[in-house]
Amino acid sequence: MHRFFSVRQGLAGCVALLLAVSCREPMSVERFVGGAEPYVFTVDMGDTTAVYDFDLYTRIDDRPEVVRDLKELHLQISWTSPSDTTFREDVYMPMNGRVSFFSRQARAPYRAGVRPSEAGEWTISIRTPEAPQGLQGMGLCVRKKR
């Protein structure tokens, strides 16, 4: 009886651990915005003790010579804080991802180890001033690290 009780306790402990892990907030969130720019993302950075990593990704569908020859994509990125302060920067995203005959996909690290100066929801807006024909949109992946 004693041995059965310890197995039962162990099983209950495993179930409790699995439930606790499954109830946590996700550590990574991805979103793709298609259509016309600007591509706007809302990012919850309510935990100022955590750091956040950001990746950008995109897909371009066009003629083979355009897809093949595109080396980088010029992006104008604006960050707006919860208190409505805006920071702007120009970024050149390398287009070194997967290439097929009429399509090119790219994913690149954007910022690593970001610790927000303010807790809350930040807005990231992306414009593509020299967008190639066939740009399908922009994606943002946010990873939270403790």
Regions found by a protein language model. Give the residues of each.
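Noncatalytic modules at the cell exterior or secretory-pathway interfaces
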Residues: T49-L56, V114-P129
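Bacterial signal peptide processing site
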Residues: R24-P26
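Edge beta-strands of jelly-roll/beta-sandwich modules across compartments, strongly enriched
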Residues: P132-V142
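Short amphipathic, basic-aromatic surface patches that mediate peripheral association
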Residues: Y57-V67
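Short coil-to-beta strand junction motifs in C2/discoidin
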Residues: V67-L75
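C-terminal motif of bacterial Sec signal peptides marking the signal peptidase cleavage site
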Residues: L19-S22
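An anionic, turn-rich surface loop/hairpin at beta-sheet edges
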Residues: E89-P116
